Structure formats: structure tokens, C-alpha cells
Regions:
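Small/aliphatic-rich secondary-structure junction motif
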Residues: 3-61, 93
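A short acidic, glycine-rich active-site loop
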Residues: 61-76
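Glycine-rich, Arg-bearing micro-motifs that act as flexible, cationic patches
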Residues: 117-139
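Short, hinge-like loop/turn segments at secondary-structure boundaries
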Residues: 58-62, 111-113, 136-137
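General small-molecule cofactor/ligand-binding pocket signal
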Residues: 44, 94-98, 149
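Short secondary-structure boundary segments
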Residues: 45, 121-123, 152-153
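Structural beta-alpha unit
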Residues: 1-9, 83-118, 155
Length: 155
């Protein structure tokens, strides 16, 4: 179930970002929609708290400093997106940095918050603390418990 009003207008929107220009377009679309309908906007940035498979196979583990740095980077990305949304007129915007694989993090927040719309970009970028958004749309589309908006973000 979702928190959608009886009119079908979303009241709670979750959007994912990795800080890339393409993800910024998805956040901008979600923010514009939230502002237009007065919906709450929750911005999520996921970060990896586990060693990549090659590193783990070599018996190397991540220290708490690396995980803290990844969390801080994801939190900064989400916070900056939230500040832009608020500056653009979104009355109720919040942000979260969530440990885990991006599609799982987005699904979990969507479920936990009883959101009625999840917004993702069609493509993204990958770097040390940010994760590819391209496959996320595919992964969440099969399991999302609410409406899904995939924003065309090709350059």
C-alpha cells in the first residue's frame, strides 16, 4: 500500500542520487513534482559498507575509516540535493545516506516510508563512494511496491 491520496496524487516521493549530473536530473524532476503537488520528498544516497568482491577475495577488509568516509560522501551528496530541492520550493525535503546496494536501499526506504512514488534516473556514474544508477531502474521495477518514475537522463 502507498500513502497516495484518494486523487492519485503522490504525497511522499523517494528519489535516489549518486551526485552525478544524470542523477541531478532525476532529483530535479522529483523535486519539481513534489513542489507542484505539495508532496514530501525523501532523497537517498547509498554507499558501500562492504569490500568489493576482488578485495574481499584477497582477504582484505575495509576499515571503519573507509566506511565512515563513504557514509560522509553519500550524506554530502544527499544533503546537497536536499538543499537544492528546498531552494527550489519543496516545503518538506529530507535526505538520507543508507549503507548498502543502491536498489536495495531505495526499495527499503520506499517501503519503510510508505512512499507512493519512487523516482530514479535511467543512467548514472560510478566512483569510489557513488554507485551506478543504470541497473537500478531495472532492479527496482520488478519489486517496487508503488509507482515508479524512470527519468530519461541520457546525455
Amino acid at each position: 500500500m502507498s500513502g497516495q491520496s484518494g486523487s492519485g496524487v503522490p504525497t511522499k516521493i523517494v528519489v535516489g542520487t549518486d551526485g552525478s549530473p544524470t542523477a541531478d536530473r532525476a532529483v530535479a524532476k522529483a523535486a519539481a513534482l513534489a513542489q507542484a503537488v505539495g508532496a514530501e520528498l525523501i532523497i537517498v544516497s547509498a554507499y558501500n559498507n562492504r569490500a568489493p568482491s576482488g578485495v574481499a577475495a584477497a582477504g582484505i577488509s575495509l576499515d571503519s575509516g573507509w566506511v565512515a568516509a563513504a557514509h560522509s560522501a553519500a550524506e554530502t551528496v544527499a544533503k546537497e540535493a536536499g538543499e537544492k530541492a528546498t531552494a527550489g520550493g519543496v516545503a518538506n525535503a529530507s535526505f538520507r545516506a543508507i549503507a548498502g546496494e543502491p536498489s536495495e536501499a531505495l526499495l527499503q526506504v520506499t517501503i519503510d516510508e510508505n512512499a507512493d512514488l519512487l523516482v530514479v534516473g535511467s543512467k548514472g556514474m560510478q566512483s569510489t563512494a557513488r554507485f551506478l544508477l543504470g541497473p537500478i531502474a531495472n532492479k527496482v521495477s520488478r519489486r517496487v511496491p508503488c509507482d515508479l518514475l524512470i527519468v530519461e537522463t541520457s546525455e
